[in-house]
Structure formats: structure tokens, C-alpha cells
Amino acid sequence: MGDFILRGWNWCRRFRHRCGYGVHSPSDFFFITFVIYERLPFYAYAPLHHLRRVVAFLPHYREKVDKFLFRLINHLRPSVVWEVGTGSGISTRYMAEANTGMQVYTFSEQSEDAVKRILSGKSSIDYLTGNCEADMDRLLKKGVKPEVVHIAHTPAYKEMFERLIPLADKHTCFIIGNPYATPEKKRWWKEVIADPRTGITFDLYDVGLVFFDKERVKEHRIVNFL
């Protein structure tokens, strides 16, 4: 009940930030209107919906957010995604289904049998457990560099951001999971928005998006996605 009331309060606060109102950049308006707010029933939504209950006891986003991650990957078309903090693995599946030509490397401190079950059906997903920094170093030595980074269900979000931001270029997108989860993370998210190393940022409440195209004027977009 507390979360429901909080979301209602934040929805009211973000009311004027809905549907791209006040956004003058054509590319940002397109992104908000046709990626964030797209309502078409994509082909993968139905089978993925039935997988959710298998891993519902593990950390996960709302289904609405996972559908957005599907659309985001479908829009960006990266060849490599790195995800730190697998959680339930359901977001991993949504992203993998959006672009069958890419490889997803998802890093988790420990292995979960239920997560293995829902990820094993996709050869494009590597579920890496244990020392994630060692796995990252190994991938980088092989020339495997992420175009999308999902900092998801991990308490080491600050460390992972600093570890991975040197890999970012104008084509990179960072997805920050649950930026309002705690007061400390909320303060850190504000620092990320103001960081001179980052470019355009989007705040959807459940997730934040960070882009790094320094040719564009740095702006922050709040989107009512509650």
C-alpha cells in the first residue's frame, strides 16, 4: 500500500512531464512518444509474461518497465549488452528477445536455478556468476565492449558505474535500475545527471537512462512513466 501511495504521489508530481509535452528536440520527442510510450503488443510480450511467475520471488521490475526495456533495445539495436545484477533474469530475457542478433552478458554474484531455467533457452545470453570484474576483464581482453550497460539489481551500482563509464562513447546507453530505491541512491542519481561526463539523461522513475553524445547540449528529461 505504501508503494502504491508513493507512486500515486509521484505520478501527480510528474503530470506535466507526460507524452513529451514541452520537449522541443525532435529526436527526444520521437524517443519519448514512439519508444517510451509505444503501446503496440510486440510479439514477445505474451510468452515472456508467462515466464514472470517462475522467478517472481527474485528482484525484478514491473512488467511495464520490462516491456520498455524490450522497446529500448529494439530501438537502439546494440550488438552487445552488459547487465550487472541479474536479479530474476526476466529483464534479461526481454532485452534478448528484442534483438536476436546481439549478445547479452549478465553478471551475478551467485547462481540461481530458477534464473538458469529461464535463461537457458537463449543461446544469446551468457549468465556469468561469481567475480564479475574478472569476467569483465576477460571479455575486454577479447574485444567485447558493451554498447548498452544495464546497472540493475546490485548494491555496487556506484562502483560499477565508475568501472564502466570509461568504456562509454557517443553510441553508449547506460540503464540505471531503481534510481529512487534509497535516499543514498537518489542522491547519487542526481550526481550522475550533473556529471560532466554524461550527456542527455532521462528519468522514468523506475529506471534512468544515460547517454554520452557530447555533441548534443546536456539536458535532463523527466518522463511520467508511472
Role assignments for model-derived ranges:
Residues M1-H150, T154-K170, Y180-L226:
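A short alpha-helical cap/connector motif
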